[in-house]
């Protein structure tokens, strides 16, 4: 059970006739991105070509879902393509599990230069929490990476680390969640609070994040990633409307 939970942790526009699918994943409150928070994304959509860089740990690769088509980046691409007809969506995945801040900085610099994304979506904190990294050091590395992303001209959406009950019993997750929220507030970038979303889904039995049956684990992972994609796609499209 703990292995599965740790895998989870580490692991349109109306004017143009664009629409967003109706929500099927319950949320305690709607994730809203301010209208002026995604200027590069809006400009890219206007050019009918949007490149998104998804940055995170093992969860970005979505191994528990057993299929790349079920990962959250793949599901986000599919949902945005449906919501934004006529716009080419290029989804770049940079998974950096268990990497140091220095390694992340080097890989991020190279990927920003190579792909020139309009939007970066970064789920930070899982590896740092697993290692028990010093919080000030973690906040510093996140702040540095945020500055690099913003200096490149890309928009940014941060995400807090993921939650699972069995992981929360053995790893102190809340300080790293708070650190990402703090970094987002300091940089004035939107933050999707995955930790609270997943805790809500667990507490309301919407998702069994500690499922043990293999078939159930796969189904839970696929639903989890699709829910994240649903919430992100709606927020992005609403923001550039």
PLM regions: where:
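Catalytic His-Asp segment of secreted/periplasmic serine-dependent ester chemistry enzymes
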Residues: 164-241
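Boundary at the C-terminal end of the N-terminal hydrophobic targeting segment
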Residues: 17-24
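Internal alpha/beta domain cores that form substrate/cofactor-binding pockets in large enzymes
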Residues: 51-54, 87-115, 127-158
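Extracytoplasmic/secreted cell-surface and envelope-processing proteins
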Residues: 62-64, 101-103, 128-133, 166-170, ...
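Bacterial N-terminal signal peptides
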Residues: 6-15
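Active-site segments of SGNH/GDSL-like serine hydrolases
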Residues: 121-127, 146-177
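Cell-envelope and extracellular/periplasmic
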Residues: 25, 93-99, 121-130, 185, ...
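Serine-esterase "nucleophile elbow" of acetyl-processing enzymes
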Residues: 25-93, 110-116
